[in-house]
Amino acid sequence: MIEYMEYVLRQFERTTSWDRDYSYENITATSDNLLQFEIPDSLNLQISNQSTPNTFNTFELSNRSIINGSLSYLYTDCGQLDKIVQNSLKVPLQQRVDTYQCLRPGRTLGTSFRSQMLLYGRMYWPGSILEAMYCKRLTPQSQLVLKSLLSAAGESSILTLYWQRNAPWGSQDIVFSTNELLLGYRFLHNLSPGRSHEGSPHGQSTLSLGAEFWLGISNLLPGCSTALRYCTHATNTGKPITLTLSLNPLFGHISSSYSVKFSPGTTFCSKYDFNVYSIESNLSFGCEFWKSSAAAHKQATNEEETSIEVATETPVSDPRYCGAVPGARSFDQIRPFAELPSDNQLYHQLMMPNSSNALIDNVNLPFPSPLLRYPPEKSVTDKFAAMIDATQFTSVLKMSSSLRDKNLRLLWEGKYKGFLVSAGAELTTIPLEAPKTINEITAQQVPRPLWLRPAKFGIQIQYST
């Protein structure tokens, strides 16, 4: 479940027309959300409040190892943020759950721009650790982000600086961190057809190519990776499909994933990992099932039927729908001359309207009239996306498994009487007394039980006003 402060941050990006989906950091977010979702490992309680239109705060309490907690505070000068940030009772569940990313090509930036900022701070106790973030929009396509992690115990503090650029063609990130003087550069380029092809099947696809390069100045250790993402929709059903391919040449790791949304409430994902140096591989599967209330489903069905009835209703007030050509003579006027041969010139003159050009001007009039009875037809992609947005989901069940780890991850997230509840567990065949990291030789020596046993379990409860 997305925490309240993270939810406010994403709404801030949405208000300021900043698209986080088109960044290299989130290029594999769809498969990560379906396979590597976070499972609570303790009892966690979060209470959040919007004290003023520009300030938000959260109090967190958990029993992870010992009783600990945190206090968060967020301030922003964005005037419209209080209108779109909703409490836990009214917020749609899709906005608080990391799920499938439905990317749409041809995005545009906002017409108006105003430099806005966001301040965030979080104090952890009893460790006395301070986490802070400062975000400042510089231009309509760039922003500056400063993150820091400070400790009162005298340990070294970490300061990270981001310069980010977000444009319709892609994104760029320049990162510098005081931790080992790390310097990095990330970019993502979108190869989409553009807005001129939105009506065609090719206009619903997006191909993104990106890479990242890192260098530790203090130890001169390099790092790099590249990734490819292809997002498209089925031409007959409009179901979104996402394929990714990533490569880390230094470590020899290759990863590919395939994700598809079969219906508004069903998603499936598979991922294959392979290492060219160690010849090790792994196959992972994940799925999620969304549940909607019966009343919401019935309301959406009734609205769809009503819209169809209104669209197919024929406006009788328009004379074009009567099928007659204006200016043409009536049948009673030409009845006496009906027996004339068709090759007689008088026959054609009587059949013509009063104006010789009237029939030519209106020859196409009866043909488009049936089409005018219906509104412009939406594509199957737009219909599928509208169906997802109109559905009011109440809960979601996530499951993932890995052949190499031989585990089963379960997570249930939903709304219950104004509370956002997230409960999950990880079941594995590794004994509890075994170390968390074991190689293949040690894994063969450690006996594995026949049945899965819980390795992690937790519940998270969030409430916001």
UniProtKB/Swiss-Prot annotation:
It is found in: Mitochondrion outer membrane. InterPro entries: Mdm10. Component of the ER-mitochondria encounter structure (ERMES) or MDM complex, composed of MMM1, MDM10, MDM12 and MDM34. Associates with the mitochondrial outer membrane sorting assembly machinery SAM(core) complex. Keywords: Membrane, Mitochondrion, Mitochondrion outer membrane, Transmembrane, Transmembrane beta strand. This is Mitochondrial distribution and morphology protein 10. Coiled coil: none annotated. Component of the ERMES/MDM complex, which serves as a molecular tether to connect the endoplasmic reticulum and mitochondria. Components of this complex are involved in the control of mitochondrial shape and protein biogenesis and may function in phospholipid exchange. MDM10 is involved in the late assembly steps of the general translocase of the mitochondrial outer membrane (TOM complex). Functions in the TOM40-specific route of the assembly of outer membrane beta-barrel proteins, including the association of TOM40 with the receptor TOM22 and small TOM proteins. It is a multi-pass membrane protein. It comes from Eremothecium gossypii (strain ATCC 10895 / CBS 109.51 / FGSC 9923 / NRRL Y-1056). Lacks alpha-helical transmembrane segments, suggesting that it resides in the membrane via beta-sheet conformations similar to those predicted for other outer membrane proteins and porin. Belongs to the MDM10 family. It holds the Pfam family MDM10. Signal peptide: none annotated. The gene is MDM10. Its main location: mitochondrion. GO terms for cellular component: ERMES complex; SAM complex. GO terms for biological process: establishment of mitochondrion localization; mitochondrial genome maintenance; mitochondrial outer membrane translocase complex assembly; mitochondrion-endoplasmic reticulum membrane tethering; peroxisome organization; phospholipid transport; protein insertion into mitochondrial outer membrane.
